[in-house]
Amino acid sequence: MAAKSDGAAASAGPDPEGAAGGARGSAGGRGEAAAAAGPPGVVGAGGPGPRYELRDCCWVLCALLVFFSDGATDLWLAASYYLQNQHTYFSLTLLFVLLPSLVVQLLSFRWFVYDYSEPAGSPGPAVSTKDSVAGGAAISTKDSAGAFRTKEGSPEPGPQPAPSSASAYRRRCCRLCIWLLQTLVHLLQLGQVWRYLRALYLGLQSRWRGERLRRHFYWQMLFESADVSMLRLLETFLRSAPQLVLQLSLLVHRGGAPDLLPALSTSASLVSLAWTLASYQKVLRDSRDDKRPLSYKGAVAQVLWHLFSIAARGLAFALFASVYKLYFGICIVGHWSVMTFWVIQGETDFCMSKGEEIIYNMVVGIIYIFCWFNVKEGRSRRRMTLYHCIVLLENAALTGFWYSSRNFSTDFYSLIMVCVVASSFALGIFFMCVYYCLLHPNGPMLGPQAPGCIFRKASEPCGPPADAITSPPRSLPRTTGAERDGASAGERAGTPTPPVFQVRPGLPPTPVARTLRTEGPVIRIDLPRKKYPAWDAHFIDRRLRKTILALEYSSPATPRLQYRSVGTSQELLEYETTV
């Protein structure tokens, strides 16, 4: 039985041979457990599972502190401009606070409506599941609120008490209260705060509950953390980044000693940008069992890397904008257009539809105005080097144009600003090298990334065996009658002739003692798994998420996810082409 979820079918069946779900360790130090990845496309959910730790709780509390400090300083600064009768600065500051917040709250409330709404007559995504234990009962469900049935469609054995009118009334009252609370929270622009607190609550519940409920709460915590990290990433680059450039340009234009309140607002915006980027990368790696999780030391190194890089970038923008306002806008639009086109050319695969993918690429283009953001799997060394060279040239050009128009009575002040831009960019590159050389989850990334034919340490040849056919023949020449007669004579004479078709040799089968798996069903998703650094489909597709949570909560054992493997289809296609 198949289930559609935005074009994807999800089903759960017997555990395939070799499809073992690897367990991950604790939230803070799960690198060793995640290293032993299973077959491609299998998302492990069995075993002891991860464990929520105290430092995870502290990380969420620090994220809340950064969120409140950024918003409070911006509103305080806007009120200060209003009291000083600086209505232009007041309007711009308030616009950069309210407009991104409204966009993010609408998106967050839209997600809430979909997650908590019950379908009315429309068939939801159907999922069928069969236990991996021999003879286990098959279960199927429609959407997260559907009832589970046996394979024949009859209700599961056992008493099925009908809900009383009192319980149904209490349930409706609870749902009404939740809707009213969420509406009030989002009207107060506190949707992200609610999601942070809910992620904290779910993480603590996963630590205190039993094994089965612990895994369920941990999955919910990962889903909530993914949502709030994506919302924060969108909001910070729509709010904090323009706010940073605006306040820095005002400070440079005024000159002299900076005021306390604009300096606090600028610092809070800068920390918010750096923290959001590091938090996004950490949650993304924690959500994928095929990648090693990011340690907190690596996350702090990323915060420092982005902090100094964005500071240099923002200060260069502010210096140039304080003198050439019109040309600054042209430079920003031009850089965004080039970066967006570059991202689109890379053919990213983050969203479930083409329209959402284009919007995502446009947002990534905004991020590329200020800092590096990896959107494509593979060795990103060349792309990262090219990007930082472009940023270095732009920073030098923007600062140079500002320095050429300086006032000669403030040469020392101008020289200090140039040195701050250069040293901040250098510190950002330094912490980036520290992260990639010492704290990257996969080990040092700036040395030789993998042994191969070029390096002497390779224990095996890189090429395929001599007797293996790696590509199909381009054409088969037509044989003539003389060749056929010669071939027949050769066969009669006993001379060996080469075979027409050759089968590529495979690995010899090794006898493995197979045991029945008892850890639960496997939820099969009829989609190829998205490559890192993209989110998995069950984090993006909310219907698929609801179905997985329903199966995970109702199953006596923790199910595992298996995406469609593209290896088998590629092998079949290559075989058909060869024949």
From Swiss-Prot:
Q: Which Pfam families match?
A: XK-related
Q: Which BP terms in the Gene Ontology apply to this protein?
A: apoptotic process involved in development; engulfment of apoptotic cell; phosphatidylserine exposure on apoptotic cell surface
Task: Write out the ranges of the annotated region (Disordered).
Answer: 1-40, 146-165, 466-510
Q: List the disulfide bonds.
A: none
Q: How does it sit in the membrane?
A: Multi-pass membrane protein
User: Coiled coil where?
Assistant: none
InterPro entries, A to Z: XK-rel (IPR018629), XK-related_scramblase (IPR050895)
The Swiss-Prot or TrEMBL record describes its family as follows: Belongs to the XK family.
> Which protein, by its recorded name, is this?
XK-related protein 7
What species is given as this protein's source?
A: Pan troglodytes
